[in-house]
Amino acid sequence: MGYIKIKMKFWSQQPVFHIYNLLYWLNPSGIINKEMPVINKYTNIIDIKSYGISEIKDTLLERLCHFIKIYYIQSSNTTYSPTKTNIIEYLKCCNHESYLTLYEKNKLLFEKGQVTNSISTDIVSVITARSMNITFKNKPAFTLYYVDNLCVHPDYRKHGIAQQMIETHYYNLRKNNKKIQVCLFKREGELNAIVPLVAYKTTGYNIKNVSLFNTSSSSSFSQNQQYLNVIEIGSSQLSLLLDFVYSQKHNFECIIMPDVSNIINMIKTENIYIYGVINGTYLSAVYVFRKPNLYYEREEALECIMSIDGFTNNDNNDNNDNNCNNSQNNNNSFIAGFNISLNKIKEKLKTTILLVENTSNNNKIKYYLNKLFITQKNDILFESPTAFFLYNYVSYSIPSEKLLILY
C-alpha cells in the first residue's frame, strides 16, 4: 500500500475506490464526498478555466478542437483526425450544461523584434465533461459527468499538468453544478490501483480482406439473413430503441446512457450509427457503431461500442425441451443481424478497420469474429486493456457483459 501511495501520489489522494481500501470492499457505500471539494495543491484556478458549451466563444472552440486534433493521440502508426463536429456535438443537447476546461499560458507578442503591449495565450491542456445517466440494478438512477478528451501539450507532459486539470476540472464541475457529484472516466492501457467499474479488452480487426459476409459458408446464417429485416435507426425511430433497452434492462447490472436529446444529436451529426433487427413493431437486436476518427496505417476505423441480443436474452428466460436449439438459432440470428449491419455501415463509410469494445453483448460478436479470423487464417490487429472507473463513487466491479453503455 505504501508503494502504491508513493508511486501514484495523486490518485492515492483522489475520491476513488482504491484496491487497498478494506472499508470499501466491506461496504461499497456509493458517493464518497457529498460536500464540495476543497482547494488543494493540485487545484489551479489561476491558469485553468472552465467554460460552458453554451457560452464559450467560437474562436476558442476552433482553437480547442485544433489542439485536440493535433495532440490527443501521437503514434507512428495511428492518426486521430476529428472535425469540430466530432468533438463538440457530443457536448450539445444534454439536460445539464457540458463543460470544456482549458489550461492557457500567456505569451507576449513581438513585432519587428520589439515586445508589444499585446498578450495572446497558448493552450497547454484541454479536458471536457458531459452529463450522462447511470442506473445500477435495483437502485435509483442518478446523473454523472463523463470526463473525456484529456489532452496535454507534449512540451508540458510529465510536469503535473494532467493532475491539475483533473482536480480543477472536477472542482469547477462541482462548483457550477451542485446536482452532479460523480464522474466517469475511461482509461485505455494498463490499469492503475483503482478498482474499475468494469475492465475489458478492445479488439482491432482488419476487415478489408476478410469474408465477413459470405453467407454461403453457413447455411444457418444464410437462412437467417434471408428473413431478417435490419434497419438504420434514426431520430424518428428512437422510441423503438428506448423501448427495447427498457425491455432488456434486467439483463444488465449497470446501464449508462446519454439524454435522449443528446442521442438524437449524435445520430443527426453522424457521430454514431444505430442498426436494429426489427420484427413487426419491435426490435429483436441492436448494434451501435461510432466513428472514433482513428486511422491505423492510414486505414479508417469504425467502432462497435454496444449491442443487445434480444433473441438469446429472451430465450434464456424460457424453460422448454427445445431451449438449447432455440438458443443456437437465436444466437445465429443475432450474429447474422450484426453481419448485415456491419455490411451496411462498411459500405456507407468505406471503413476497413473494426474495433469491438467487449461490453454488453459484444462478447458474442467478439467470439464470432475471433473464430472467423482463426478459420480464415487472418491475424487480429491488437487487443488493448480498457476500463471505466467512477470518481467520487464506490461500487464493486461488474462483468463486462453486464455493462450497457452508449457514449
Where are the regions that the model predicts?
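N-acyltransferase acceptor-side catalytic subdomain
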Residues: 14-21, 25-28, 32, 56, ...
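Conserved N-terminal entry element of GNAT/NAT acetyltransferase domains
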Residues: 2-61, 210-235
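A conserved beta-strand-loop-helix scaffold within acyl/acetyltransferase catalytic domains
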Residues: 47-154, 187-188, 232-314
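Active-site/acyl-donor-binding loops of N-acyltransferases
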Residues: 181-228, 286-316, 329, 339-407
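Classical protein tyrosine phosphatase
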Residues: 168-182
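Conserved acetyl-CoA-binding loop-helix of GNAT-fold acetyltransferases
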Residues: 152, 158-171, 329-345
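Acidic, Ala/Val/Gly-enriched low-complexity intrinsically disordered segments
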Residues: 318-321
